[in-house]
């Protein structure tokens, strides 16, 4: 028994010594800047590294949980290790704005730049969900259109019909937010607990618009030559305190999340994309006092069979016009646009389904569907893509050929892929003006939930275009070309 006890004690001593040595060896785990100490400076360096700033951390030391990767989980462990202090919370809420408080009443309310009065849509201005509050600065009127807007404290305008008075004489206090993230169901969801329903801005950055100083038919032109964003930035107005670091380590979209305190009573949450341009749409809404962002994942078709390359995808196909919305009409046949769009949309539906996609149609009969209802239907479907079918028409017959329009930056590549295939189909039959992919603020393309395009299949006011467009065989060729563009686009996604 004594010998056994001694053996146990000796073994315990060895284990204890081993544990002490292990602890000592692990003591420098977290020494990200390799200065021999683990402190807040290491936290700061790891934050910078995860925000893609030019720093060179010791990655072995930064791998706090030893899983072979450096991500948000390691940052959380390092913060806990060094007991990083939370920012000082205000003991009293300061009043940041007073006056007439407005409440957004329309879901997905479009916002406009506040430094101009024009009715100019811009993909750089995020929509605001119903329930958002802000102080009214003044009412403004666009002298060209006569439209009226509320200029809000966040610096953007909304149509007067999209907001109502919440308090005739109120105050907005400084806001506090905390954030969490989850990954499920094809989305990365970022949820912010907010003291009240603050306005916010969401931007994809960096992104340049080389023609924005040129005025088109609908104001500044937001055409993009390529989609270059490496991060999503959400800036929250009237916010002086932010806590929590969303864990995005399991997200296929984001590699890091960081907070930035700004000098104008705002905080910015920056989500770094894993790959440049790897962004596929988002949805945002208020759920009680929680602002919920749902960022769409890419539907991976790489393992699909050659005969069903679009399996797993959901695509909304919108047949433009309908009912009393007849659209343009043919110069020789007298056919209405609404008739041809429905014929082509049905053929496209059949083709996409044959390739494995689930297709949601905005209409299947000669009925009028309000544009707002098309957008709502699209959001509810949670699709991978949205395609609206239209016909062009002008006052002179020489204009010819198809055009594909987009609004959001991440829709441009889809427009280019579709128009390349559609134009090639035209060239088999007639020489056609190549009109390409262009930016345009068509209402249905402004949904943010997925890449969305509007295809003008050709000019019904051009006799040669019309002669092709009204034939069953060419409509089938167009449907096949659009579907080919979809497959090529989806395969090309980062």
State the predicted function of each range.
Residues 325-335, 393-420:
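A short, glycine/acidic-enriched catalytic loop
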Residues 5-92:
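Cellulosome-associated attachment modules in secreted, modular CAZymes
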Residues 40-47, 72-75, 79, 342-345, ...:
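Extracytoplasmic/secreted envelope proteins and their assembly/folding machinery
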Residues 411-438:
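Active-site-adjacent substrate-binding region
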Residues 385-395, 405, 433-494:
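Active-site-adjacent mobile loop/cap segments within catalytic or ligand-binding domains
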Residues 128, 143-144, 308-310, 353-354, ...:
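Extracellular/periplasmic catalytic domains that process cell-envelope and extracellular macromolecules
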Residues 294-377, 381-383:
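Active-site histidine-acidic residue metal-binding/catalytic motifs
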Residues 87-313, 391:
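Short linear recognition/processing motifs and adjacent strand/loop elements at protein termini
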């Amino acid at each position: 028994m004594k010998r056994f006890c001694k053996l146990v004690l000796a073994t315990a001593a060895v284990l204890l010594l081993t544990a002490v040595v292990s602890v000592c060896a692990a003591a420098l785990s977290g020494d990200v800047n390799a200065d021999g100490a683990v402190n807040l400076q290491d936290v700061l360096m790891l934050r910078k590294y995860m925000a893609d700033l030019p720093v060179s951390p010791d990655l072995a030391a930064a791998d706090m949980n030893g899983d072979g990767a450096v991500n948000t989980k390691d940052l959380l462990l390092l913060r806990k290790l060094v007991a990083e202090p939370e920012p000082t919370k205000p003991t009293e809420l300061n009043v940041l704005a007073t006056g007439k408080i407005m409440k957004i009443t329309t879901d997905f309310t479009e916002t406009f730049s506040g430094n101009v009065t024009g009715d100019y849509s811009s993909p750089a201005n995020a929509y605001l969900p119903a329930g958002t509050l802000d102080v009214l600065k003044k009412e403004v009127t666009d002298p060209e259109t006569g439209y009226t807007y509320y200029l809000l404290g966040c610096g953007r305008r909304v149509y007067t019909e999209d907001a109502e008075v919440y308090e005739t004489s109120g105050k907005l206090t400084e806001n506090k937010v905390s954030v969490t993230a989850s990954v499920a169901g094809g989305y990365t969801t970022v949820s912010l607990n907010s003291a009240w329903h603050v306005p916010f801005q969401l931007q994809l950055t960096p992104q340049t618009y080389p023609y924005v100083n040129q005025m088109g038919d609908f104001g500044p032109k937001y055409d993009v030559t390529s989609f270059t964003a490496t991060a999503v930035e959400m800036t929250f107005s009237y916010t002086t305190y932010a806590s929590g670091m969303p864990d995005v380590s399991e997200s296929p979209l984001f590699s890091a999340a960081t907070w930035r305190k700004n000098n104008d009573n705002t905080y910015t949450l920056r989500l770094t994309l894993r790959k440049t341009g790897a962004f596929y749409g988002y949805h945002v809404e208020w759920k009680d006092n929680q602002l919920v962002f749902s960022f769409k994942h890419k539907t991976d078709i790489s393992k699909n069979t050659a005969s069903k390359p679009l399996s797993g995808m959901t695509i909304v196909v919108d047949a433009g016009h309908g009912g009393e919305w007849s659209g343009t009409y043919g110069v020789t046949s007298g056919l209405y646009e609404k008739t041809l769009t429905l014929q082509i949309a049905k053929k496209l539906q059949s083709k996409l389904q044959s390739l494995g996609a689930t297709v949601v149609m905005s209409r299947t009969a000669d009925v009028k569907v309000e544009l707002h209802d098309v957008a709502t239907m699209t959001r509810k479907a949670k699709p991978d893509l949205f395609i609206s079918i239209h016909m062009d028409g002008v006052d002179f017959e020489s204009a010819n050929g198809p055009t594909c329009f987009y609004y959001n930056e991440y829709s441009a590549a889809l427009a280019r892929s579709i128009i390349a295939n559609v134009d090639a189909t035209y060239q088999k039959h007639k020489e056609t003006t190549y009109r390409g992919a262009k930016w345009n603020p068509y209402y249905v393309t402004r949904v943010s939930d997925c890449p969305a395009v509007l295809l003008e299949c050709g000019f019904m006011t051009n006799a040669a275009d019309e002669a092709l467009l009204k034939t069953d065989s060419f409509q089938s060729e167009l449907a096949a070309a659009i579907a080919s563009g979809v497959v090529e686009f989806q395969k090309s996604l980062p």
